[in-house]
């Protein structure tokens, strides 16, 4: 195993460990107030479904998969005929958030190795997931494989100025050789994608974009509202956390 490959696997595991710690703390915080979070989840799921259906209708009996459903994914209130979510931490989330996790079948597996037959789903959702995973491209390949011809993909990921990719690579290098200094935004992600790199994930796949959106120009224009620390100051120079969204059809 090469240094970079081993480092990537360690980053992916570290990102999962940090996410689980965060969600455990969140579960304790929202206990007894789940209704507020459920209302937010319902609104987000409806907004995304409306965005998809403005481009391509979803059948009432559609079989829907969410890759990286996480603790509060779209699938739980998406209104699917059959809804399935996959996430490496799914077994933990069923225990932490029983109020809604039971609304869909969830399977503890990463998006790089989906345990489904080819052409199994009418709709696949992947909402802000791939930059936390071991292989963003492999996830897109698997999504294309399990989508039925004519099926719909909803994909969203954060994109950033190229500065953050370079900084994340440097951070990964010193972590790989054992230096203990850890920067939180880089520890929570395996990769910081530029807009070009996010688009390149789709190259050569049997997917045709029906709708493509990004808010890079808006994020560049507005920047952070307040400068609270050095990271916010950097965002004024190098934009961070712009949205890139694709709604695509399987050819």
Regions found by a protein language model. Give the residues of each.
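Class I SAM-dependent methyltransferase Rossmann-like catalytic core
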Residues: 2-57
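Class I SAM-dependent methyltransferase SAM/SAH-binding core
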Residues: 65, 69-113
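A short acidic, Gly/Pro-enriched loop at the edge of an enzyme's catalytic core
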Residues: 109-124
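A short SAM/SAH-binding and catalytic strip from SAM-dependent methyltransferases
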Residues: 123-134
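A short glycine-rich, Lys/Arg-flanked "PGG" loop and its adjoining helix->strand segment in the class I
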Residues: 137-152
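Conserved class I S-adenosyl-L-methionine
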Residues: 154-181
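Short alpha-helix
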Residues: 184-206, 210-212
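Core SAM-dependent methyltransferase catalytic element
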Residues: 203-207, 211-213, 218-251
């Amino acid at each position: 195993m090469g240094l970079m490959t081993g480092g990537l696997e360690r980053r992916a595991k570290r990102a999962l460990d940090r996410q689980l710690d965060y969600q455990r703390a969140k579960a304790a915080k929202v206990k007894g107030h789940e209704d507020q979070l459920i209302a937010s989840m319902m609104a987000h799921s409806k907004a995304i479904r409306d965005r998809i259906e403005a481009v391509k209708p979803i059948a009432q009996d559609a079989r829907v998969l969410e890759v990286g459903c996480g603790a509060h994914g779209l699938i739980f209130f998406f209104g699917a005929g059959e809804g399935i979510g996959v996430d490496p931490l799914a077994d933990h989330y069923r225990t932490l958030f029983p109020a809604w996790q039971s609304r869909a079948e969830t399977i503890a597996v990463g998006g790089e190795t989906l345990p489904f037959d080819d052409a199994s789903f009418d709709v696949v959702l992947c909402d802000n997931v791939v930059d936390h995973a071991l292989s963003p491209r492999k996830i897109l390949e698997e999504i294309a494989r399990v989508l039925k011809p004519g099926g719909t993909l909803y994909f969203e990921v954060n994109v950033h100025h190229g500065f953050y990719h370079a900084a994340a690579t440097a951070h990964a290098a010193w972590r790989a050789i054992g230096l203990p200094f850890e920067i939180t935004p880089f520890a929570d992600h395996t990769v910081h994608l530029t807009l070009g790199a996010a688009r390149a994930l789709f190259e050569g796949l049997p997917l045709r974009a029906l709708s493509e959106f990004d808010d890079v120009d808006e994020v560049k224009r507005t920047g952070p509202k307040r400068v609270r620390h050095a990271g916010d100051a950097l965002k004024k120079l190098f934009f961070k956390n712009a949205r890139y969204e694709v709604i695509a059809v399987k050819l």
